[in-house]
Amino acid sequence: MLINSIEEIVEDIRQGKMVILMDDEDRENEGDLLMAATMVRPEDINFMATNGRGLICLTLTEQRCRQLDLPLMVSVSKASRGTNFTLSIEAAHGVTTGISAADRSRTIHAAVADTACSKDIVQPGHIFPLQAEAGGVLCRAGHTEAGCDLARIAGFESAAVIVEIMNDDGTMARRNDLELFAKKHDLKIGTIADLIHYRLVTEKTISCISEREIITQYGKFMLHTYLDTARNEKHFSLVMGDIAGSEPPLVRVHINKSARDLFGIESPDGFKSWTLSRAMEKVAEEGRGVVVFLFYPETADDIDCSIDGMISPIPKKTGDVVYQQIGTGSQILMDLGVHKMRLLSAPFRFTAISGFDLEVVEYISCE
């Protein structure tokens, strides 16, 4: 079964239909049912509960969450993909127990109405909102952001109802299963990677605002400063040599962590991670490569918590911050002309980076 174009996906959403959305065309991908929240009916909720079987969620923009005075469930997500769950909600009026398909549909409409405010909903409830990152899939390549983006492109409020698709036996549906599901229910299938491509034709959320040569202990680098217009934050890239050649360059996408980069703290289990200095040294040894430095301000409390997390012997989930910033780092690499790369990282599944015309051909772990 062929993957449908984003234009076809948007048209079905505009008509109030559901679609299936995967990360990309990989056979191991899972998929969500998705439709515009403004168009949801009780029968749609019933279909999602009966056939999708996952957790029915409502994707909302940060602005809408503020409008509803809706706080995040936790201030820092420890989920593997950094999903921003808010407190669950119920419509303040017009529902009974809240769990029926009609009640859940009513709750969704109460939350996405133009004039909706905090008085229109109560907590807890049977609908689980997810707060999308500003910038949508160009900043975080997730189903939450894709739901908001697709609803907006289709002409509706930037809010969608999504649910993971599970098989009869309770396992997650993969592409082969999703194709059979789509054929059975006459649904179109799209990908977040294609949505990223679609948006990049006309928009982006980062721009290079300065370039200058700097001399470091590892040699000369060209320092590029980027402005993330979605969050009004600055990030940097350090480039050495000609990275536009036929051979994939070394690439490190690095998120600042003072406990690691300044104090040199390492995991008690012996696992070594790439510090900023190690990455720069590795690039200098080879003579060509890129270090993208994504900078997010840290307070003393943030650093203290980070230290506790790094020295704890308890296994930790990783990748949540990485997952959230895939889009930002990918846009910077695109701007620098990188396509195929040898990534300074332990093996990690980077969602939908094909949408940015990027491909990891090799992972290089820190030794």
Predicted regions and their residues:
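Catalytic domains of riboflavin
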Residues: 1-367
